[in-house]
């Protein structure tokens, strides 16, 4: 892999025995591993040096050749090649099997590929492979047909002979009986003796008859079996088979075990089978057609690739390199070994025993048993536990087979290929660094020295502080004083990456410029805590070092924290002042009536500050100050004759002036109180309208001012700040009476229990709200708790209510509301009973959180997997389509106001068409980016909706185009080509997943609409939608427009639609207790919901088409997030929904290469149809398919990505059989094979850039004489300066690629 793009495809296939022998460096013949005395590998064993290479660098086994100068020589004594020991990680061996075995993946996987190919049930296949039944592998039908009359004659003769023999035997017994009776008669024997003789003869006759009849029946059975014998017939009766073989062995062949399968595969005619299956599909129905379709897929896979089906039966087993299944010595002289060695050992032992038995010519039954054991040994090596009981090691632990090495979180894919450990990294606890700038972090000196060690050592040598690298290393390890100076010099301008786990979105890793600090803790800027979701209660963070100049440049330009002010999920700032900073700025900007210096007028800000220092002026007093660089705000009344740029006398407070000084000079004056909302608006505005540098500087100013004034505000919290409202007992008494009345009605039987509960809950909710209001009214504006909550610095009114007012209603462990409230507040203290019932909710909260975190992480993983190949690939796909999105709605007065969801729908999109007003004037041209400014202009012009480009309507073949995606929310500019928008979408949806509630919400036992049904909300609902599952209690939607009638019976209701177009009536049976949304006789339109309940997205797709299904899914997902107050932009959900609907199920294949029932990518389906139509043939027909994200991930074109996601063995089995090629378009597959990902700067369009010097540069290179003939050498030798100057080449890029 010399260059980044050395190959563009990765294909997987079935390995034949020749391939396996080709990879191998020798055959492993013995089960030994290493000699326990010498600890050297045994010859021909599992660790043999002759096969796998030397265990020491440049040294053969016997020691004849040592040192690198003998490189490449093969020792004539021990046969080991002199080379590096690391070849033991690459070289494979093989085991030559004495009998073929089948590959367990292909016969035991679901579905069984071998079974489909040979048209055998898995049960029958198992019988053959494990020597429980014989399989007929070939029948010579022609000679059988020719010989049948003669054979029939022979058979009849033999049968007649048998009948004659039976009859003569019986006649002989009868004669003997007569003689015996005559003899007894002569002797005058008793009647009893005669009876005895008769009985004995009867018994003999019966036995003869029975034996002969059985033989005749067996003869008939064998004959019938032979006449109808055909290939692939199974015979489980060994006796019958033997007789068949003895009598008619000339006309057929049969065997058992993998040999039978192998013979069968050798003679299998794929082409004929495919033809016959196509015929069945064309003319068949039901089960036969379905099975034929499934079989055709398998047969086609072998026909269209150069895979040989014989690869499913192995004659040789590969042995993986010994370093991948190591054996290490433990302290006590014992050895720990990989499970694979045990599994290989069993295979070799059984194989050797089988060879010996075959050489000895052992009886068939013994040989077969040994072959079966070999088959089982190879099975457990490949996939232990797939069939029968797994092979266990000590302590009954199942051994890890080759399949287990690939599967799961600890498998090869996820552990080593997708998640690698990183050198040049460290981790430590974080503490706050309020003195830092936004782009800085504090790095502990010792950690920095360790991270930058190689750089420091090189620099020490360059500066002649050390003679060589070795002494430089010694200096670093002894912390010499020069080392710190060099370190200081090296870390300037060298960014480091900080990461806090869990990294839920891209802001979890950001770049900072390190500042050396004492101590051992990393210092973090307070404003980036929000992005990392970090706090300073013991959180740890990891530091990584970008090494190459390219990596440093990317870290600085793309990842520096001051360039990551916006959140990728909604484009709003994430670096907002919080907590202390808010309280400081709030303290600065509030107005206080009647405080010192109120009403005074100051000629300048300095004068006002002087008065403040002299204690003549309060920070919050309303005064007038003359401001030199005043930028008026909307609604400021300018005095007559005032021009912008002139000084102005402004009525404000000193605090307000100080606050405004933190903002950019040309920023309009802010007169509002700086609470959380106002600060958010300011930062938002800065991010939208100012360069990043200005925004970052302003944020730092706000942070500094916030901390400074928070300290001076003296905000503290004491128990005396918590005031219980005096009116509380009176309020409670009033509601107690109401509750008693309800209880009385229940006792008299006027209402039932559910109604009682509902009424009580309503009463106590009202009481709680009233007490909360009384509490808020009683708090003074200067109360510190009031200021904290009002400013948005910390806490909310609900928490304050519980401390100072009333705890209120709580839920029991089932999630139902207990109808008696906790009447105390925490300030007053809870009674024992109150405390007890309050603990339920607390415990449930903790349990829920733990569950939520795991579920949310898994959801993110599935989302990333389904969308990881969505990358912006082109500028414009050229589509004319788009989505119509509302931007304004009329309010109660009929005036237009911004739609509440415009932030997450129309904002940051590209307009699809020109927006024109009623007069036809173009207000915004198509292709314009729809930012806050544009939206405000359109609103002012009275526009209510616009048509915008969307990912859902994008026509790019792979990925999406920049215009359909619109603005990148993280940067605020149009998205760059190469941006991995799929992963950003997955992170944006998954990151707030933890905040979503876990539980399916129970309406407190209330008999509300739908009879107290569970409403699936929160995370489970999101999963249900993205997995495209049919929800519980699904509501039908009208399939046709028409009139509806309601028919009721004892058990259920039927809703019957009589369509307008006169087609057949459609009936929907529903439960009697369903809440109807329509009335009898009402007219319904297509897609209208008929009863209350969730709708099945698959029905929406079937009835209303893909466009409606997409809109439905986006709206539903957004509904869940919005209900929790989480803002995510629609475009992220659209990216995922587009991936769910990108496949088509083929219904009729026409003349195309597609198979009926096949799931084809939409692009491939359309291309294939275009090709077929252009050739004048019939195209394929298909219907769009809605796939859940897990299923869509597994159905991806990339087998590497699918295998590393889930069901690894199934994916690899299928991919190998189909000989799949991975086009390496997504990110995952490139990470796995160690290539740069094809996103961002890894795209070919960025990596394959050549630099051409400009004309001026070329000219400046060749200043001086134009030709050598005119050249004067005096210029060099004389004392005059030369006429031209040389340019050092290494300072100049000539544009040639010398690499």
Curated annotation (Swiss-Prot):
Biological process according to GO: DNA-templated transcription
Family annotation (NCBIfam families): PRK14906.1, rpoC_TIGR
Binding site for Zn(2+) 1: 60, 62, 75, 78
Subunit structure: The RNAP catalytic core consists of 2 alpha, 1 beta, 1 beta' and 1 omega subunit. When a sigma factor is associated with the core the holoenzyme is formed, which can initiate transcription.
Pfam families, sorted: RNA_pol_Rpb1_1, RNA_pol_Rpb1_2, RNA_pol_Rpb1_3, RNA_pol_Rpb1_4, RNA_pol_Rpb1_5
Known function: DNA-dependent RNA polymerase catalyzes the transcription of DNA into RNA using the four ribonucleoside triphosphates as substrates.
Reactions it catalyzes: RNA(n) + a ribonucleoside 5'-triphosphate = RNA(n+1) + diphosphate
Keywords of the record: DNA-directed RNA polymerase, Magnesium, Metal-binding, Nucleotidyltransferase, Transcription, Transferase, Zinc
Cofactor(s) listed in the protein's UniProt record: Mg(2+); Zn(2+)
EC number per UniProt: 2.7.7.6
Binding site for Zn(2+) 2: 877, 954, 961, 964
EC top class, as a word: transferase
Organism per entry: Paenarthrobacter aurescens (strain TC1)
A single GO molecular function term of this UniProt record: magnesium ion binding
Cellular-component GO terms for this entry: DNA-directed RNA polymerase complex
Family in the record: Belongs to the RNA polymerase beta' chain family.
Identification of the protein by name: DNA-directed RNA polymerase subunit beta'
Domain of life the protein comes from: Bacteria
């Amino acid at each position: 892999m010399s260059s980044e793009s050395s190959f563009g495809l990765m294909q997987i296939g079935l390995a034949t025995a020749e391939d396996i022998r080709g990879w191998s460096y020798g055959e492993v013949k013995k089960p030994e591993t290493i000699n326990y005395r010498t600890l050297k590998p045994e010859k021909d064993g599992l660790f043999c040096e002759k096969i796998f290479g030397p265990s020491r660098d440049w040294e053969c086994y016997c020691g004849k050749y040592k040192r690198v100068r003998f490189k490449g020589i093969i020792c004539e004594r021990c046969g080991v090649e002199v080379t590096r020991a690391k070849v033991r990680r690459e070289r494979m061996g093989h085991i030559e099997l004495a009998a073929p075995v089948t590959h367990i993946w292909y016969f035991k996987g679901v579905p069984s590929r071998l079974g489909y190919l040979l048209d055998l049930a898995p049960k029958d296949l198992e019988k053959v492979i494990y020597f429980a039944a014989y399989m007929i592998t070939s029948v010579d039908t022609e000679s059988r047909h020719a010989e049948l009359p003669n054979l029939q004659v022979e058979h009849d003769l033999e049968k007649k002979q048998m009948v004659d023999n039976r009859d003569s035997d019986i006649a002989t017994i009868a004669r003997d009986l007569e003689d015996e009776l005559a003899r007894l008669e002569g002797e005058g024997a008793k009647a009893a003796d005669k009876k005895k003789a008769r009985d004995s003869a009867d018994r003999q006759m019966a036995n003869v008859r029975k034996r002969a009849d059985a033989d005749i029946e067996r003869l008939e059975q064998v004959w019938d079996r032979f006449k109808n014998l055909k290939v692939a017939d199974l015979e489980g009766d060994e006796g019958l088979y033997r007789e068949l073989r003895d009598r008619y062995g000339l006309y057929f062949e049969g065997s058992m075990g993998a040999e039978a399968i192998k013979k069968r595969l050798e003679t299998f005619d794929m082409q004929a089978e495919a033809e016959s299956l196509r015929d069945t599909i064309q003319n068949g129905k039901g089960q036969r057609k379905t099975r034929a379709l499934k079989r055709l897929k398998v047969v086609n896979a072998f026909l269209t690739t150069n895979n040989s089906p014989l690869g499913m039966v192995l004659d040789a087993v590969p042995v993986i390199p010994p370093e991948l299944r190591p054996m290490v010595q433990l302290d006590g002289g014992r050895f720990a070994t990989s499970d694979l060695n045990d599994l290989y050992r069993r295979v070799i032992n059984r194989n050797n025993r089988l060879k010996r038995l075959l050489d000895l010519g052992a009886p068939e039954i013994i040989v077969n048993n040994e072959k079966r054991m070999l088959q089982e040994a190879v099975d457990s090596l490949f996939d232990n536990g797939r069939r029968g009981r797994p092979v266990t090691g000590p302590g009954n632990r199942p051994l890890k087979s080759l399949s287990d090495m690939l599967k799961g979180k600890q498998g090869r894919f996820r552990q080593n290929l997708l998640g690698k450990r990183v050198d040049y990294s460290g981790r430590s606890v974080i503490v706050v660094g309020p003195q830092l700038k936004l782009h800085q972090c504090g790095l502990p000196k010792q950690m920095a020295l360790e991270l930058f060690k190689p750089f420091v050592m090189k620099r020490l040598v360059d500066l002649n502080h050390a003679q060589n690298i070795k002494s430089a290393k010694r200096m670093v390890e002894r912390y010499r004083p020069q080392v710190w100076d060099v370190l200081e010099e090296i870390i300037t301008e060298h960014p480091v990456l900080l990461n806090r786990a869990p990294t839920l979105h891209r802001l979890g890793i950001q770049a900072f410029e390190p500042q050396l600090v004492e101590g051992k803790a990393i210092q973090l800027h307070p404003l980036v805590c929000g992005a990392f979701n970090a706090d300073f209660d013991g959180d740890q963070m990891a530091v990584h070092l970008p090494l190459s100049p390219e990596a440093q440049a990317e870290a600085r330009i793309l990842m520096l924290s001051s360039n990551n002010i916006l959140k990728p999920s909604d484009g709003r700032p994430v670096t907002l002042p919080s907590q202390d900073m808010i309280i400081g700025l709030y303290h600065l900007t509030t107005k206080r009536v009647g405080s010192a210096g109120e009403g005074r007028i100051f000629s300048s800000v300095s004068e006002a500050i002087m008065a403040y220092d002299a204690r003549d002026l309060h920070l919050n007093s309303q005064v007038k100050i003359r401001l030199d660089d005043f930028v008026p705000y909307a609604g400021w009344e300018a005095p007559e004759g005032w021009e912008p740029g002139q000084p102005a006398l402004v009525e404000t407070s000193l605090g307000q002036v100080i606050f405004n000084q933190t903002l950019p000079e040309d920023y309009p004056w802010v007169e509002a109180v700086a609470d959380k909302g106002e600060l958010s608006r300011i930062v938002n505005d800065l991010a939208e309208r100012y360069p990043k540098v200005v925004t970052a500087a302003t944020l730092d100013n706000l942070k500094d001012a916030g901390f400074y004034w928070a300290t001076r505000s003296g905000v503290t919290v004491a128990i005396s700040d918590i005031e219980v409202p005096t009116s509380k007992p009176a309020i409670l008494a009033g509601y107690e009476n109401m509750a008693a009345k309800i209880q009385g009605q229940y006792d008299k039987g006027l209402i039932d229990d559910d109604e009682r509960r509902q009424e009580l809950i309503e009463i106590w909710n009202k009481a709680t709200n009233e007490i909360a209001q009384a509490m808020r009214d009683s708090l003074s504006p200067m109360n510190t708790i009031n200021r904290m909550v009002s400013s948005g610095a910390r806490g909310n009114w609900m928490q304050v209510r519980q401390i100072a007012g009333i705890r209120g209603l709580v839920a029991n462990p089932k999630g139902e509301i207990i109808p008696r409230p906790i009447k105390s507040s925490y300030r007053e203290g809870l009674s024992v009973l109150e405390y007890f019932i309050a603990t339920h909710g607390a415990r449930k909260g903790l349990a829920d959180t733990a569950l939520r975190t795991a579920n949310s992480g898994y959801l993110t993983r599935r989302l990333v997997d389904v969308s990881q190949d969505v990358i912006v690939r082109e500028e414009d796909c050229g589509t004319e389509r788009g989505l119509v999105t509302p931007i304004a709605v009329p309010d109660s007065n009929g005036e237009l106001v911004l739609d509440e969801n415009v932030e997450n729908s129309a904002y940051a999109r590209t307009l699809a068409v020109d927006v024109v007003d009623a007069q036809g004037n173009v207000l915004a041209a198509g292709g314009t980016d729809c930012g806050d400014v544009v939206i405000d202009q359109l609103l002012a012009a009275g526009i209510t909706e616009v048509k915008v480009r969307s990912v859902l309507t994008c026509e790019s073949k792979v990925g999406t185009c920049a215009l359909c995606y619109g603005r990148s929310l993280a940067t605020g500019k149009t998205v760059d080509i190469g941006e991995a928008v799929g992963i950003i979408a997955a992170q944006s949806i998954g990151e707030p997943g933890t905040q979503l509630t876990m539980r399916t919400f129970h309406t407190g036992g209330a008999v509300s609409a739908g009879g107290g049904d569970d409403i699936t909300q929160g995370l489970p609902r999101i999963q249900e939608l993205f997995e495209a599952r049919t929800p519980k209690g699904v509501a039908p939607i009208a399939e046709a427009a028409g009139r509806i009638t309601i028919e009721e019976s004892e058990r259920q209701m039927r809703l019957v639609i009589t369509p307008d177009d006169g087609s057949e009536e459609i009936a929907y049976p529903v439960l009697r207790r369903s809440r109807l949304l329509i009335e009898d006789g009402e007219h319904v339109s297509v897609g209208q919901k008929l009863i209350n309940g969730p709708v099945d997205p698959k029905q929406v797709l079937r009835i209303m088409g893909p466009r409606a299904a997409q809109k439905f899914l986006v709206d539903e997902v957004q509904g869940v997030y919005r209900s929790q107050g989480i803002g995510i932009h629609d475009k992220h959900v659209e990216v995922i929904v587009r991936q769910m609907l990108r496949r088509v199920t083929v219904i009729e294949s026409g003349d195309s290469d597609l198979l009926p029932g096949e799931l084809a990518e939409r692009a491939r389906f359309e291309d294939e149809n275009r090709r077929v139509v252009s050739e004048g043939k019939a195209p394929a027909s298909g219907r769009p398919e809605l796939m859940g994200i897990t299923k869509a991930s597994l159905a991806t074109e990339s087998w590497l990505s699918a295998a590393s996601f889930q069901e690894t063995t199934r994916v690899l089995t299928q991919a190998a059989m189909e000989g799949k090629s991975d086009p390496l378009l997504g990110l995952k597959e490139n990470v796995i094979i160690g290539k740069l990902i094809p996103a961002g700067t890894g795209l070919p369009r960025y990596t394959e850039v050549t630099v051409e010097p400009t004309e001026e540069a070329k000219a400046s290179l060749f200043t001086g004489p134009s030709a050598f003939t005119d050249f004067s050498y005096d210029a060099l030798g004389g004392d005059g300066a030369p006429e031209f100057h040389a340019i050092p080449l290494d300072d100049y890029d000539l544009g040639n690629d010398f690499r």
